[in-house]
Amino acid sequence: MMRKLLLSFVMLAAVAAVHAADFKYQWHHTIYGKTRSGNTPISVIKTTDGNYVAFNAFGSNTLTGTKLYFDGEPLKDAEGKEIEGCPYKGTNANTGNDNLLLQKMNPETGKVIWTVYSDKGYLYNNKSVYPTADGGLVFVGDVRNLADKTETTLLRMVGADGQKTEVNYTPAGNGRTSVEGVIAKIDKDGKVAWAKLIATTTHPTIKGKTYGEYDIYYKGLAVDSKGNIYVCGNYMSAVTFVKRDGTQEIHQAKNTAAWDGTIQTSAGDPFIAKLDKDGYLLQFMTEDESNVKFATFDKMVIKNDVIYVSGRLQGDGTATIKFGDTTLQPNDCWNLLYASVKAEDLSLNYIKMLVAGKFGGKNYAVQNMNLQYYNGSLYMTGLITGSLADDATSEPFIATKSRMREAMIVKVDAKDGTRLVGGIDGQSITSAYAVIETKDPITVWVYGYALLAKARLNKYTLEEGKLLKGTEEIALEEATMGMLGEPLIDGNAFVSMARPRYDSGTILGATGPATTFFNWGIVLTKYTCNDILPDEDTSTGIKDVNVQKDRVANCNVYTLAGVLVKRAKTMAEATSGLPSGLYIIGGKKIVVK
């Protein structure tokens, strides 16, 4: 009997070894402009023709340099000319202009297929890309003109064919810069099909003294199976959209009392704008009633033509915000907001709030860095100071240990919005940018950084309804780390984006010397790992249609090593005939006696 038990343990250990994490290096690239600011990783996406597109912003400043460097050398366009960003004349060497950079790459080799960039206009705080059915993509971003405040070209994009496409905007004429949103369609060959303003805002003078240069934030982007485009964010003034027939539709923000005209204050209303395939307004969704301080939708994903958004909202404990039949009453912290929305008519399936709390009675913060749809669940990742609870009377399910920010993970059921688990790093200053599910149903990898130290993966384990950070860590890149971009999970592949300072540091699995940067730089790296659990909702690659397997609530039984023992729909069915022992049933540890 003892021999059989020992043999069983050996077999379980062997199975566990099969699922052990082994992230294998495939390739990497380094990217930077010669500026002391800027050089920002944004996201990696997979196009419907099976390639990758890396979206970054590179810096330019005539005092330090305007060229773009790729793998340590000046990058050239299709005609062999060295690429240069906007000729921004900085007031000092510490400033810079952020230029758009889109690069389509072969996923196996990392070889660049084409490059699209901008040489006029400054990509400001928010920018996104999303794949389209033809193998191309849509770009949306907040754009500001720093090079010349009187110039009418807000953004100029240079396609892979060398053709330049301009988006024009008439400045206010008051010597101040203005920010507006730009949307553009890039085809599969890197040609700019079209580019234009998403809408226009009024830029009012606030309280008689401050010019409102930044009236709307375009934060999230998605495209449905019909090619319609969805943009989310928040706005502080009147915003005017144009419809296909040339008529205009104006929406006025309600929550403007807290706005002082600068980017430093939090104010305004959340929105989702539905546009047709050419960028004309079809429908606009915002709250029905509100008197809170501010609310915003920060991130957006879409699955099977259902939109999911995550955001934040702040009130005073008595003020309310109403969406349809749901009324929320946020306190004076940054509370976490998330919703499920029908793409067809922008009506709500649900909208929910997780209540934030302060550390030490005064410090609070929530930053949404990513929103993932993954095997029927939503993962919200980012940074937090303070705590989160399910409602105003519940005990917090996560809380920081200091006033400094820590990595945060919240998992909810995408179907009904029920919060499933939450996790926190436990140390500052850290951040989370993505979750990777594994073949062990009770563990996940969390991608994030330890500030000024490394980009990394940390193993979290589900224990008693919480995701707890363990000791297992994989340092993907050891360097003076400042931020990350949204990574890509592609089957068993993981493509990471990091922003180290001074040089590219030590990259896991890479050989050769590090790339020296002028200051900040970008590192794009691909790994593969058999421990990664792919998303069930695999793309067909045809017209961007996703096929989802039937999902039902289950009580499937696994060993602790993650080996499936039996499938079951109920607990009674799961435990019937099951030998005594410890199992994972329905995602929870269960002792069967």
Segments predicted by a language model, with ranges:
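Positively charged n-region of N-terminal signal peptides that target proteins for export
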Residues: M1-L5, K593
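N-terminal leader/targeting segments
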Residues: R3-K4, A13, I302, Y373, ...
